[in-house]
Curated annotation (Swiss-Prot):
The gene is mutS2. It is an enzyme of class 3 (hydrolase). Residues 707-782 form the Smr domain. Keywords: ATP-binding, DNA-binding, Endonuclease, Hydrolase, Nuclease, Nucleotide-binding, RNA-binding, rRNA-binding. The lineage of its organism: Bacteria, Bacillati, Bacillota, Bacilli, Bacillales. This is Endonuclease MutS2.
Length: 782
């Protein structure tokens, strides 16, 4: 279809509303590509797709598509030998996770809605590949940010060495900073980090007392950050280990990327299917917002839109109208007052057809019928071009000439105020001639006009119908109701009377018009009354038929469910009975066998108590079943994070780290962390651990997230600020508040200049009114 038509009908606004309902860039891309189809089979299939998903969306809670993203670029990069990072691998993992959740949802849906078929969704679910191995390979190797320590044996060893070396460095430096002899020589008794090296803050005047490397100094120059020589080699060792760690991480990521490349075709299919589902769900969401319904498409030319309304207008205030081209009608001419809704009716018809052929449910009552148009042509509104210096009439006529060149029997043509902008008699003649030409071409036409000559046009030609927009004489305003089959009538006398014009003048005016025109107006008035009555009856009949069909469908469904339930009960009862008979027969055979053995061993001397013992074995059999059921119950006890559990499928103990959802949990078994079904876990009582004496060393005091420098001299304030920032970094604070007061602003300026240069500060800002305003600076730490 022509882009100009889509622009006039504001289809881009509809696309924008659908786009707002998408979750991923995959769905958004498909919305941006959405265009009306013109092939009958394609149009029908697109509508079936949307309607099926809309039915499911309206009845069920769909799985979340959050986190779904386009990953084809990563897949192609993996295929040509690139190495994916952890973030990219996680997006691929999320794609697999989303598709698996949708598969699970669909399987449950099929079980719950027994007898209901979803052929389109079923086909999409069958297209989804099995990517379980790749999911586990990524999931068990990395989290959201980094590789797990146990991603490889080598990586675990390297990180273990880094940890132990760091611990030895800390112990060494702790001895230095806790030494009584060094207390006065240190700016603070802490260990900090500069240039990725562990250092201690030494007062500048005691530099010669510490053998080591100076890595940094405070802004005031009074504190030097020294790496003691006793830890230099250990820090060097950590640097080497970090290098080894990077190499091993690259190796593991290369291996994972290879797995992705091996599954590239399957991943691209998964991306395409999930993107299409996001697109269809967005259509379903938008359709529900406009209470959209599914039209029936027919090969023969048909337009029937019961109670249609323009989807971009306010649903609460817009007047819905039935728009219909009755059998053998090819042209509809709408007359009525200006601003009465004629143009909106044209746009409603055009936009609904464009929406329907794009696979969107349409804003009408159930039962709408449409044919598929190859093109929709519009001449709507004043498109006068100032640059071309065209008049309103010339502008419209230029557009009409272009339409007449391309319109055919597969087209819908919409003319707004046909023939307007020139002499009324010439304009009316042109309008009738243009309509004759379009009818000869075979296009379906709806036109609006205010020329009275066109009212009689339909009575002289076959296939032409009049319509009008209603005017309320009592309120002197249009009602925006469309009356199909009823031409517009003049309301001049009624309006004049309502406004207070003398009856003598009105009566004299009536004598000046012909008898025929009087009779025509009276006939039109009678037609209006009859149309309203028939339309009300037809809507009521449609409602009753729809109600009856729904009741029939519900009863059929319930009857089918009852038959299925009855069948399943009978099968279940037979199975239970067969199991009991089988068990009893086996037990009886065992008892007889044992009795025979006893008789052979003891002759006929079989005691009563021995028979009782054998009989008791049947009772024992049922008790064993009871015990088994108790164990089964125990397995389903509520499990929470921190619980000790037995993993039944592995026979191993583990600890629950996190409850993912109602069905899955993350469990640590030794050095292995796995996501497992909760039904596979059996809760265990934690063993009571004997209390052990703990020796705690406090390396630093707990600090607040704010530092109050009010009352400090400038130099002292900066020294205090330096020490505070070091402690805040070691406490892993992300944000701290420096209170300097307002005063002259000198301290505030000094603090902010100091923060600007400080290596531990990534950013800072003035405080919000709720935080202290200009008297506070908020610093964000690296």
């Amino acid at each position: 279809m022509r882009q100009k038509t889509l622009d006039v009908l504001e289809f881009e606004k509809i696309k924008s509303l659908v786009a707002n309902e998408t979750i991923s860039d995959l769905g958004l891309e498909k919305v941006n590509q959405m265009m009306p189809a013109t092939n009958f089979e394609t149009v029908v299939f697109q509508m079936e797709e949307t309607d099926e998903i809309a039915q499911i969306y309206n009845k069920h809670r769909l799985p979340s598509l959050s986190g779904l993203s386009k990953v084809s670029a990563f897949i192609h990069r993996a295929d040509i030998g690139g190495v994916l990072n952890v973030s990219e691998l996680n997006l691929i993992k999320r794609l697999i996770q989303v598709q698996n959740q949708f598969k699970t949802f669909y399987n449950q849906l099929v079980e719950e809605d027994e007898g209901v078929k979803y052929p389109i969704l079923d086909d999409k679910m069958n297209q989804l590949p099995v990517l379980t191995d790749l999911f586990h390979q990524i999931n068990e190797t990395c989290d959201t940010y980094d590789l797990y320590d146990n991603a490889s044996y080598e990586l675990q060893g390297i990180r273990s060495k880094i940890s132990s070396t760091n611990q030895r460095i800390r112990q060494n430096l702790d001895r230095i900073v806790k030494s009584q002899a060094n207390q006065k020589k240190l700016s603070d008794a802490i260990v900090t980090v500069r240039n990725e090296r562990n250092v201690i803050p030494v007062k500048a005047e005691y530099r010669q007392d510490f053998n080591g490397i100076v890595h940094d100094q405070s802004a005031s120059g009074q504190t030097l950050y020294i790496e003691p020589s006793s830890v230099v080699e250990m820090n060097n060792q950590i640097s080497r280990l970090r290098h080894d760690e990077a190499i091993e991480k690259e190796r593991v990521l290369t291996q994972l990327t290879g797995y992705v490349a091996a599954d590239k075709d399957a991943l691209l299919v998964a991306e395409q299917v999930m993107g299409q589902l996001d697109f269809l769900i967005a259509k379903a969401r938008y359709s529900r917002s406009i209470k959209g319904t599914k039209p029936i498409f027919k090969e023969e030319r048909t337009v029937y839109l019961p109670k249609a309304y323009h989807p971009l207008l306010n649903r609460e205030t817009v007047v819905a109208n039935t728009i219909e081209f009755m059998e053998d009608i090819e042209t509809v001419i709408i007359t009525g007052p200006n601003t009465g809704g004629k143009t909106v009716t044209l746009k409603t018809l055009g936009l609904i057809i464009v929406m329907a052929q794009s696979g969107l449910l349409i804003p009408t009552l159930d039962g709408s019928q449409l044919s598929v148009f190859k093109n929709v042509y519009c001449d709507i509104g004043d498109e006068q071009s100032i640059e071309q210096s065209l008049s309103t009439f010339s502008s419209h006529m230029t557009n009409i000439v272009e339409i007449l060149k391309h319109a055919d029997k597969h087209s819908l043509v919409l003319f707004d105020e046909l023939g307007a902008g020139t002499d009324p008699s010439e304009g009316a003649a042109l309008a009738m001639s243009i309509l004759d030409h379009v009818r000869k071409i075979g296009s379906l036409v709806m036109a609006t006009t205010h020329y009275p000559e066109l009212k009689a046009y339909s009575y002289n030609r076959e296939g032409v119908m009049n319509a009008s927009v209603e005017f309320d004489v009592d309120t002197l305003s249009p009602t925006y109701k469309l009356l199909m089959g009823v031409p517009g009538r003049s309301n001049a006398f009624d309006i004049s009377k309502k406004l207070g014009l003398s009856l003598n003048i009105i009566n004299k005016a009536k004598t000046m018009i012909g008898t025929d025109e009087k009779e025509i107006n009276e006939m039109i008035e009678s037609l209006e009354r009859n149309y309203k009555r028939v339309e009300t009856q037809r809507l009521e009949l449609d409602r009753l038929v729809k109600e009856a069909e729904q009741v029939h469908d519900d009863l059929s469904k319930q009857y089918q469910q009852f038959q299925n339930y009855e069948k399943s009960l009978i099968e279940e009862a037979k199975e239970k009975a067969n199991q009991k008979i089988k068990a009893a027969t086996k037990e009886a055979d065992d008892i007889i066998k044992d009795l025979r053995q006893l008789r052979e061993q003891k002759g006929a001397d079989v005691k009563e108590h021995e028979l009782i013992d054998k009989k008791k074995r049947l009772d024992d059999h049922y008790e064993a079943k009871s015990i088994k059921q108790n164990v089964q119950k125990q397995k389903y006890d509520k499990i929470v994070a921190g619980d000790e559990v037995k993993v039944l499928s592995y026979g191993q103990k583990g600890e629950v780290l996190e409850i993912v959802n109602d069905e899955e949990a993350i469990v640590q078994m030794g050095i292995i962390k796995m996501k497992l079904p909760i039904e596979d876990l059996e809760k265990k009582q934690k063993e009571k651990v004997k209390p052990t004496k703990m020796v705690t060393r406090q390396n630093r005091q707990t600090i607040k997230t704010e530092l109050d420098l009010r009352g400090y001299r400038y130099e002292d304030a900066l020294i205090e600020l330096d020490q505070y920032l070091d402690q805040a970094v070691l406490s892993n604070y992300e944000q701290v508040y420096i209170i300097h007061g307002k005063g002259t602003g000198a301290l505030q300026k000094g603090v902010q200049q100091h923060l600007k240069k400080h290596k531990s500060v990534s950013d800072f800002r003035g405080g919000m009114p709720s935080e202290g305003g200009f008297g506070v600076t908020v610093a964000t730490l690296k």
